[in-house]
Each structure stands twice: as structure tokens, then as C-alpha cells.
Amino acid sequence: GTTVGCTLNDEEFYRAFKKGAEPDLAAIRRFLDHNPAPYVSRSLDLRGPVSTINNACASGTDAVGQALEWIEEGLCELVIAGGTDEVSRIPYLGFSSLLNTSGRPCRPFDAGRDGLNLGEGAGVLIIEARASAERRGVRPLARLGGYGCSADAHHMTAPHPGGAGLERALRQALNGRDPADISFVNAHGTAT
């Protein structure tokens, strides 16, 4: 399987649209046709499910979560999962207009946090079922023990004050494990 998280940052389309022109929809079609993951899948002649996830800054994490679900459900033995994003004018100006960017280093869990820092990057993980790795004689570098994602629908931008959605996501991610046994948490910490 192949799953990639990404965002669409096509400035030419946006500029033409803002000028009242009828922009070429090729960029939108490329994006809607799930371009990144199918490209990787075709290039490597892979079989299995293919998905491109567009969920803003959570896309890469959600791609990894989907990979874990595919393996747990027996759809795949091995999944290439990753995420990519670029800094471009549209998201930069959007976040800047919300006055939630910071000139200081990002400190998402600090009481004195004052905003986010935009950046760009990409990362890919090869996620494989334990039985498949053992058959191939591969020693895993890490184990993905769980994944949790929850939208509590309390408010458009604010979570439920009691943390119901957060608790549900944490329980999903812990997957029945003791929190003391967890060595790494990939948290969505924007510092806003």
C-alpha cells in the first residue's frame, strides 16, 4: 500500500482565480486524482490500496495512521507512508493574517507560547506487519503501537472544554497499553 499526506499550494491557480479569469483546472485535477501516492505506487510498481490524505498539518500523521489500519485489517503487509508540505505564499499569508505566527522558536506546550512557525519538509516511513518482517529477516527500527484521531465537533476551532475528543484519541493511540510504556509521542503541537 501507499499513503501520502500533502497539501495543495498552487499559487498560479489562485492568482488567476482572484483576477476573475477562468484558471486551468489541471492543478486541481492533479490534486484530486490523488497525485503523490499514485506516483510513488506506479514508480515502484506497487500493488495494494493507494491514498493521498489532505488534512493540513496532520496529513503525514494521518497517512501513518491509515497505514497502521491497513496492516491491522490485513489489507497490506507493507505500506509506504509519509507526508510532505512546502511553504508557499498562500498558507504563509493566511497564517500571518490570523496573527498566530511567532518570530521565536515554536514552543507548543509552553504556557508562554505565542504562535507557530511555518516550515517545509517531507518524511517517509516503511510500515510492515510483524509477520512479514520476520519472514524477510528484517529487524524493525521501531514499533508503531497505536494511532488515535478524533474530532469532537464541539466547535469549528475549539475542542470540547472537558477534553472528550482528546481523551478518545489518546485511548485509541494507547491501544490498551500503559502510558508508562510509551517512548515516543507524535503530537500535533502548533503553539497557537
Residue ranges and their predicted role:
Residues 6-8, 55-59, 83-88, 146-151, ...:
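Acidic, glycine-rich active-site loops and adjacent beta-strand->loop/helix elements
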Residues 2, 40, 60, 67, ...:
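Conserved small-residue
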Residues 76-77, 182:
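Short, high-confidence coil segments that cap the C-terminus of an alpha-helix
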Residues 13-16, 187-192:
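Short, intrinsically disordered, charge-balanced linker/junction segments flanking boundaries
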Residues 6-18, 23-66, 75, 91-118:
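Conserved catalytic cysteine-centered active-site region
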Residues 74-75, 137:
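Glycine-centered short loops/turns at secondary-structure junctions
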Residues 1-8, 38, 140-146:
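Short coil-to-beta-strand
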Residues 101, 105-184:
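Condensing-enzyme catalytic core mediating Claisen C-C bond formation in acyl metabolism
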